[in-house]
Amino acid sequence: MNNTSFMILGIFILTLLGVYSIYKPFLLSLSVAILLAMATYNIVNQLSQKLNSRLAGTVISTMMLILILFVPMIYIATSGVEYISQLDNTAITQTVDMAQKLLQKIPLINEYAIDKINDDQIAKFVEQSSAYLATAGKAGIGFAKNMFLVLLFYFFINYYGVAMFNFIKPLIPVSEERFQRMSHEVSSTMEVVLYSTIVTAIFEGFLFGIIVSYFGFNGLLFGIIYGLASLIPVVGGAIVWIPVSLYAWSTLDSVSAIIIALYSIIIISIVADTFVKPIIIKFIKEKMLHSTVEINALVIFFSIVAGMSTYGFWGIIIGPAITSFLIAIIKIGVDYKAMSDT
């Protein structure tokens, strides 16, 4: 490299650092928008072809994303707060007492229940919760801002995506065939993860909403909450149905609480999550998306856990995307090695 090349490289690196410093606050939202655009690329293309307009296809796909992301959050933020404010405080206290008695009967947890679930700890928890609720508005505004940026970037990436791709294509240091295969691997994984996550969350939330509405609870509200909770690995919907069943025990009767608990365990956790969910994923993968990419369910599970622990809510999308991108890069490296050996 001559002096001119070094100078150009240095200017390029400085420019990248400057761009990074300017756009750093938007990198997470931009990354999520790019991944969502990759996951919905086929749908946007089909809509654009049927409507004979890229703008119309982009607008409709963005509106669908708003319906899926924004509407449930707004409903929880409005109806959820109003519903919680109407709960019976006496019943809540009875529910906590009941939980304490139940935990004390479990050998390995009884000492923890005595130390952590008592009047002093509950009072401390209420005080901390009040402080959290006081700042929840700021957090909610921040999340809404990030979601708005994701939707904004998503719209422009879909609308100008082809032009942007053609602009950066000459800079990609791999052949077009390998790049197409790598992007197909990542986008196919994102499609399966995104669509199966949305469908199973709606399905499980619908099942829980039916049972709680039968016993007089707000089925739509708790269905949405349960659907979002089901996205959390390991614990999932248990963080919803356990408090609801205990509250039903205090306000209704023991039979209602047992029915809610058994229904949540047997119908949702065992039947729906264990047996129906794989069928839904297989149907989406083979019949709807016609994807041939083999996805290890365990790898996807741990990538979602790691993604959520690092990036929070958006980790559901970022975790599998980064993992699938790594796998695609490794496959390209293996191909290069095989070519060099021959």
Q: For the regions a protein language model found, what residue spans apply to each?
A:
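Short, amphipathic, aromatic/basic-enriched membrane-interface segments that mark the entry/exit
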Residues: 1-5, 118, 191-195, 227-234, ...
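Anchoring transmembrane alpha helix of integral membrane proteins
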Residues: 1-75, 327-342
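Hydrophobic alpha-helical transmembrane segments
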Residues: 8-31, 129-167
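Alpha-helical transmembrane segments and their immediate interhelical loop/hinge regions
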Residues: 142-251
